[in-house]
From Swiss-Prot:
NCBIfam families: PRK11045.1. It comes from Salmonella typhimurium (strain LT2 / SGSC1412 / ATCC 700720). The gene is pagP. Keywords: Acyltransferase, Cell outer membrane, Membrane, Signal, Transferase. Homodimer. This is Lipid A acyltransferase PagP.
Amino acid sequence: MYVAMIIRKYFLIIALLLMPWLAIPSVSAADKGGFNTFTDNVAETWRQPEHYDLYVPAITWHARFAYDKEKTDRYNERPWGVGFGQSRWDDKGNWHGLYMMAFKDSFNKWEPIGGYGWEKTWRPLEDDNFRLGLGFTAGVTARDNWNYIPIPVLLPLASIGYGPATFQMTYIPGSYNNGNVYFAWMRFQF
């Protein structure tokens, strides 16, 4: 119930942040700049999804070289939670997704996150079901230890997938005893 309350509370904020991009009309390819390409991709993923996705958080790992042992001994590194999204593959074979997820953070408190993800996708084998991806996610999160104030995030993404299942991950950079966290989840496409 608490998770549902957090998601409901912050869904409106995330939706309001994404709304201007979703309302932007498409422009010709010759007129596009980097930001217009980004907003067009977000809007197309919102309007024309090919798949609906289930996100299942798998692991958080605090880089041991960047933390005192006393802290890592107390931190939660099993971020159970769930998320949902919608995604599509573009004509170049790259992945685009919109998602919302809630999981238990390092302090075992609920952390919602939502945003847009993009990955350049490679299929190095004859079997096109196998793929590797590198890209980014841009979104908004909120944490208990920051009083659930919405915080924008721009993070790297990497993945390895086969068929409808993808192991996707990011790294949250930081300073000593802060950040420097590897976070990964499974994404299942339907």
